[in-house]
Design a protein with these regions (language model features):
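Short conserved micro-motifs at the rims of enzyme active sites and ligand-binding pockets
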Residues: 25, 187, 207-210
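Non-heme Fe(II)/2-oxoglutarate
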Residues: 1-89, 111, 193-195, 199-225
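Catalytic core of non-heme Fe(II) oxygenases with the double-stranded beta-helix
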Residues: 102-175, 202, 206-211
């Protein structure tokens, strides 16, 4: 008897190598965010800080900061390779940064709840600083449960025979479809756990819109203008 697991999901993993100055600049920005936000009483009892949820001006715009320009370039290179691998060299698509934000997990079991990014097509996470001796705080992807009835629910860990849990190693980049549900498992490291998340929109080139693909924003017209 053979049991076949169908519908693989492409997740790109690459371990980047920033030079010392670039790595230090990114870490400094995340340290400032950590110190400035966690000192506020309303956030002191949280087990995570995510810049897209806190509502502080500019905290979802890290991709505009000088410290993250190297990372932007690396992300562009690997998004291009990801799309070429899936669609071929003539796919004609363009990637756009929607937003990028910092994530800080507390050392005593910090987590991020299960979620997806419905506003984007591709999402990415880059680990700026983690405890290399402690691989807790993994990113876990959850398989879609649409294929099983509610009376025959299969636990995710039993169904995920092909993996789905990624260790947060320093300078690791992960790229994945934004609709893929994911969460951060409890982090128990001795040092800070800093990462940057990106949401990307994938569109056609300007003037190249076609059925079932999102046209370039330059081709949009505000309703009522």
């Amino acid at each position: 008897m053979a049991l076949h697991w169908l519908f693989p999901t492409p997740v790109l993993q690459v371990d980047l190598e920033p030079d010392a100055a670039t790595a230090a600049a990114m870490q400094q920005q995340l340290e400032q965010f950590d110190a400035q936000v966690y000192q506020h009483p309303e956030f002191s009892d949280r087990n995570n800080l995510t810049g897209d949820l806190l509502g502080h001006a500019g905290l979802d715009q890290l991709h505009r900061m000088d410290a993250f320009q190297w990372l932007n370039g690396q992300l562009a290179e690997h998004v291009s390779a990801y799309l070429r691998s899936l669609l071929g060299p003539e796919h004609g698509l363009m990637a756009h940064n929607q937003k990028a934000w910092p994530v800080v997990c507390a050392r005593n079991g910090g987590t991020v709840d299960l979620h997806s990014h419905r506003n984007a097509q591709l999402s990415a996470v880059f680990y700026v600083l983690t405890d290399p001796a402690n691989e807790s705080g993994e990113l876990e992807f959850e398989a879609p449960d649409d294929y099983f009835s509610h009376v025959m629910a299969i636990p995710y860990r039993d169904a995920a025979v092909s993996g789905g849990v990624f260790a947060p190693l320093p300078h690791r980049l992960l790229l994945f479809p934004s609709d893929l549900r994911h969460r951060v498992l409890p982090y128990e490291g001795n040092g800070p756990r800093y990462s940057v998340s990106y949401d990307l929109a994938i569109t056609t080139a300007p003037g190249k819109g076609c059925e079932m693909r999102t046209p370039h924003p330059m081709d949009w017209v505000p309703l009522g203008s």
